[in-house]
Swiss-Prot record:
GO molecular function: ion channel inhibitor activity; toxin activity
Organism (species): Conus ventricosus (Mediterranean cone)
Designated name of the protein: Conotoxin VnMLKM-02
Secretion signal span: 1-24
Domain notes from UniProt: The cysteine framework is III (CC-C-C-CC).
Lineage: Eukaryota, Metazoa, Spiralia, Lophotrochozoa, Mollusca
């Protein structure tokens, strides 16, 4: 009887946990696939934003939001 309980525990609990872990990975993969379609300029903007850096602005409308070394 104990052996059957162990087998049921393995299949009902551990197998379920293993499959739930795989399902959690899928949204990240879809997000990564969407990011591969970006142009190099869009990709650079995302990276600079994540690093907290700013791009150079056009000299015509340079303001406080621009990077200091640009204007």
């Amino acid at each position: 009887m104990l052996k059957m309980g162990v087998v049921l525990f393995i299949f009902l609990v551990l197998f379920t946990l293993a499959t739930l872990q795989l399902d959690a990975d899928q949204p990240v993969e879809r997000y990564a696939e969407n990011k591969q379609l970006l142009s190099p300029d869009e990709r650079r903007d995302i990276i600079l934003h994540a690093l907290g850096q700013r791009r150079c602005c056009d000299p015509d409308w340079c303001d406080a939001g621009c990077y200091d070394g640009c204007c």
